Amino acid sequence: MKILKFQIKDFRNLKKIEYQPSPGLNIFYGENAQGKTNILEALYYLATGNSFRSNKEKTLISYESSSLQVQARYNHQERIIDSSITYGLDGKVFRINKKRASYNHTDRLRIILFSPDDLYLVKGAPYKRRFFLDFLLGQISNEYLFKLDNYRKILKKRNLLLKKEETNSRSFAIINDIFMDLAAQLLISRLNLINVLDEAIQEIYPQINNDGGQLKIRYALSFPVDSGKINLDILKDSLKKQVESETEKEKKRKTTLLGPHLDDMHIYLNEQMARLFASQGQQRNIVICLKLAEIMTFRKIKGFFPIFLLDEVLAELDDSRSNKLLKYLAQSPFQSFLTSVKLEKFEVMDASIFLVKDGCLLGKE
């Protein structure tokens, strides 16, 4: 998947931008608050229907405008797709090839994003890492998103019955069965994904780093599982045993104490827990490798590459790692869009480079 051209209109400080990107690495540079990140945000908004910076959609519309529009034409599995999103007084409308569509459409734009907030993947709370896994699985499978949504609804009902102390009711028994079934299905999807991600990370880390180190990830369940090869039936049995043993604790605390909503992903750098020992620079480097592993995992499962957005990824990286990353991106088969404040000290090659100033795209200065 590669974007052939896109147009952004009345999105934050971007009054009107039209751009035909390179199929490889595209770099937007310039001073802060000029609109670099807004370009990436607009593409992300087109792909997901959400902003990665704000929950208030009204703030996305340019000052003195009543609506915004983002359009893109891209190739997808040997076909040309046109997609657009408009948002204004009449609400939000997403279209694929000029027809109204939903965000689970198979031809939607697929995006992997690196933003400064992703540094919390290493040292942040477990929900950040769960979101990392769920977002990738959602990009890969609409079925996973459907199951995740159902799980959250069932979890809410289960917690409500625990609060009402109705654990002996028939309703609780039925909800318990559904809860365990959905939980096991989500877990097997996450575990399978972790295996593919870990393989990708093992391959990517030495290409970005020359420190001889090793990066790996492991899935941390919120309940014990019988030893041996894990499959769906084993997960269901283990979950059932644990639910039965935890019932009294759950009654006292009036909430569900196990399940995929409480799991974690552990990250190890040179056999040590990264969240405890990794420096700020190492954390950024780890997240970059995780994001590249996302792309390779997506490609392995879906058969095509998503678009890679990198916001201020070069900040806090030394010159050697920055140049190595830029070279890797320039030579990669996927399309990437990167923002940076300055480029003078970097050996940028095979990239389309534009200065962003006052919400406008200018040629390289």
Swiss-Prot record:
A family per Pfam: SMC_N
Positions annotated to bind ATP: 30-37
Any one of the GO CC terms: cytoplasm
GO biological process, any: DNA synthesis involved in DNA repair
Matches recorded under PROSITE patterns: RECF_1, RECF_2
InterPro entries per UniProt: DNA-binding_RecF, DNA-binding_RecF_CS, P-loop_NTPase, RecF/RecN/SMC_N, RecF_2
SUPFAM superfamilies membership: P-loop containing nucleoside triphosphate hydrolases
Coiled-coil ranges per UniProt: none
Subcellular location: Cytoplasm
Signal peptide: none
Family annotation (Gene3D superfamilies): P-loop containing nucleotide triphosphate hydrolases (3.40.50.300), RecF/RecN/SMC, N-terminal domain (1.20.1050.90)
A GO molecular-function annotation: ATP binding
UniProt keywords, alphabetically: ATP-binding, Cytoplasm, DNA damage, DNA repair, DNA replication, DNA-binding, Nucleotide-binding, SOS response
HAMAP family: RecF
Record-stated family: Belongs to the RecF family.
Entry-linked PANTHER family: DNA REPLICATION AND REPAIR PROTEIN RECF (PTHR32182:SF0)
Functional summary from the UniProt entry: The RecF protein is involved in DNA metabolism; it is required for DNA replication and normal SOS inducibility. RecF binds preferentially to single-stranded, linear DNA. It also seems to bind ATP.
Protein's name according to its UniProt entry: DNA replication and repair protein RecF
